[in-house]
Amino acid sequence: MSEAIKTDVLIVGAGPCGLFAVFELGLLDVKVHLVDILDKIGGQCAELYPEKPIYDIPGIPMITGHGLTESLLEQIKPFNPTFHLNEMIETVEKIGDPGFRVTTDAGKVFECKVLVVAAGGGSFQPKRPPVPGIEAYEGGSVHYAVRKMEEFRDKDLMIVGGGDSALDWVLNLHPLAKRITLVHRRDDFRAAPHSVEQMRALVASGQMDLLIGQVTALDGEGKELSAATVKGNDGTTTKVACNAMLPFFGLTMKLGPVANWGLHLENNLVPVDTGTFETNVPGIFAIGDINTYPGKLKLILSGFHEGALMAQKAVKYVYPDKRVVFQYTTSSSSLQKKLGVN
């Protein structure tokens, strides 16, 4: 076992709620490390909608998931948090009062006084479409999320699906791609009506293609696609040139090892005290989409509020003998000094 990394607080999840919690804890002189199963910072914002607009962040009329992540990282820079990406927490062992020993699937060990679970609903995994051999092209021509729109410039792009994600990316990537072919198993879409109307207008004007059926075969070399075969509902097959594919078959969410940490669960969510966002285990808190309480709204702004209240209780575990006085960043010279603004 490797030597333990000691920290005041360990946050599981580096999405917006986890990042803002770093800010609130940093104002209270609390040292933080974060662990995330993803290979990037930002949680759902980075994985699912990095370039899609978000309209309900207070004071910001519109911002992308990527933009929000970057702004939060800039905000917490004075507190110098440490990130551990591509790692999943496997075990949590109580070693003190307070105190936990936490291990990851990479063999890393942490010792912390407080554990904050900000892992969304668990880890998101895209549903793989039932196409023989598609896994061979994952990480190459087959993408389950759009992280950089420029990756699809001048591509023969096939988008598979009939929901909002599929239609949104048809419309957003149409100006960049060489040609887009949308494939759906039926001529009936579960997307916003105005998106469907715009897509049909592009098809009618010959600017993109729509095939009703299912992808049954892929051609290519290594991880690079060259064509995909679509079988129509009438049994006819069409081979389409395709060097990039975006399948949108939904996502599965796995709670993972959180279920084994001794936390009470309700429908795979963690009940919390709404005054502190502490779980049934003293010293373990849950903020963001992973928690539940009466009136819970799964909004980013709700997670920010939860992180602020969590920090006020967590600091008492870190500094049990310290009198903590609540201060405002607008008027406290000591807080402004921590933020580097005076």
From Swiss-Prot:
Its cofactor is FAD. Transmembrane segments: none annotated. GO terms for molecular function: ferredoxin-NADP+ reductase activity; flavin adenine dinucleotide binding; NADP binding. Keywords: FAD, Flavoprotein, NADP, Oxidoreductase. FAD binds at C17, D36, Q44, Y49, I89, F124, D289, T330. Its EC number is 1.18.1.2. Binds 1 FAD per subunit. Pfam families: Pyr_redox_2. Coiled coil: none annotated. InterPro entries: FAD/NAD-bd_sf, FAD/NAD-binding_dom, Fd--NADP_Rdtase_type_2, Ferredoxin-NADP_redctase_2. It comes from the Bacteria. It catalyses: 2 reduced [2Fe-2S]-[ferredoxin] + NADP(+) + H(+) = 2 oxidized [2Fe-2S]-[ferredoxin] + NADPH. Belongs to the ferredoxin--NADP reductase type 2 family. Homodimer. This is Ferredoxin--NADP reductase. It comes from Rhodopseudomonas palustris (strain BisB18). The lineage of its organism: Bacteria, Pseudomonadati, Pseudomonadota, Alphaproteobacteria, Hyphomicrobiales.
